[in-house]
């Protein structure tokens, strides 16, 4: 009995140890238990899916796509399948938006140098600015080109050019002349802050941003071209100033993009030609000219511009002369039929001497869909057709009567055939003789 108490003490000590070490052991056991529970639930879910997945396959095939929107079911049921293509289309649209943004990005810096003008370090501007810098000798022909293109005034540009020329005159000297083009290059890009308004007004028709880029370049080139040509005396500077207001820096922007606004300048003379053609044609025949010859002239203008007045003018005149020779009734027919009546007037000219009214009616009916009415009227008017119809009716009646007579004759034949049927009765009587013989044998 004595060893009992110490055992109890040891047991209590063990319990205390388990009590102290219990939380750590439980913390270690919890994660595997949770993993087991999750695995069991996943297995149950998979079984449930398999059970529900086997039912539609066994029952109706792809009829239960709505109740099972899983990816596996979508792979097997190719009924819908359009969702994949929609996703691909979304990706394609995203790829399409990316190049739009890439194209829009260069337009922003293209507009920035026109407003801020200081960041002249764009790739296009560097390449263009490097040429006039090291080659000051080739710059004077640029000035001559500008003088040839002089057409529009700009006072602000002239004042700024005078200031730059005076500064260059004050800094007379060999070493300073090398710095003069640099200062002019720095001041010149600041000058287009004023003329971009006029430049944009001239380039609105072209709707091209390239016309805005060469503004600082052209101004810098002209400024550099003028500064090295300025000698030490200020008198020559005044002469260059008188030449400077004539070029007017904005004209350079309009002279370079001439290749761009050519469609605009060509459209303006086309409009003038369009206006002149109907004006010249409305005098002899206003109704027909507005309908037929104008589209031909427009087509010729779009194809070949210089050949428009040569081909369109005389052709329209000859057409007018031919149409004036026609009567007023032919003109009305052309107005009703439209462009499809061009071949009809020459056809109408033939029946002028014979039957103008009937010829016009025939043309109108040929163009319309009432061609079936004329044959009906002609059939009613022709006596031959009526006679043929009457004869056909009589012949049909006779044929019907003949058929009736044939039927009656056959009926009579059937009646006569009844008498002939009685003859076999006699034969039947003769056939009864063997019956008597049989009776005799019996």
Curated annotation (Swiss-Prot):
Name recorded for this polypeptide: Syndecan-3
Cleavage of ectodomain (site feature) positions: 383-384
First and last residue of the signal peptide: 1-44
Sites where a glycan is attached: 78, 80, 82, 89, 107, 161-163, 170, 172, 315, 367
Biased composition (Low complexity): 157-175, 276-287
Subunit record text: Interacts with TIAM1. Interacts (via heparan sulfate chains) with PTN; this interaction mediates the neurite outgrowth-promoting signal from PTN to the cytoskeleton of growing neurites; this interaction mediates osteoblast recruitment. Interacts with MDK; this interaction induces SDC3 clustering; this interaction induces neuronal cell adhesion and neurite outgrowth.
Tissue: High levels in neonatal brain, heart, and Schwann cells, barely detectable in neonatal or adult liver, or adult brain.
Record PTM Phosphotyrosine, positions in chain: 409, 419, 431, 441
Pfam families per UniProt: Syndecan
Molecular function terms, GO-annotated: identical protein binding
Region (Disordered): 1-25, 55-85, 151-175, 180-199, 225-244, 252-327, 339-372, 419-442
Comp. bias (Acidic residues): 61-75
One GO BP annotation of this record: cell adhesion
UniProt KW Membrane keyword: yes
Membrane topology: Single-pass type I membrane protein
PTM info: O-glycosylated within the Thr/Ser-rich region which could interact with lectin domains on other molecules.
Cytoplasmic side: 409-442
Main function: Cell surface proteoglycan that may bear heparan sulfate. May have a role in the organization of cell shape by affecting the actin cytoskeleton, possibly by transferring signals from the cell surface in a sugar-dependent mechanism.
Origin organism lineage: Eukaryota, Metazoa, Chordata, Craniata, Vertebrata
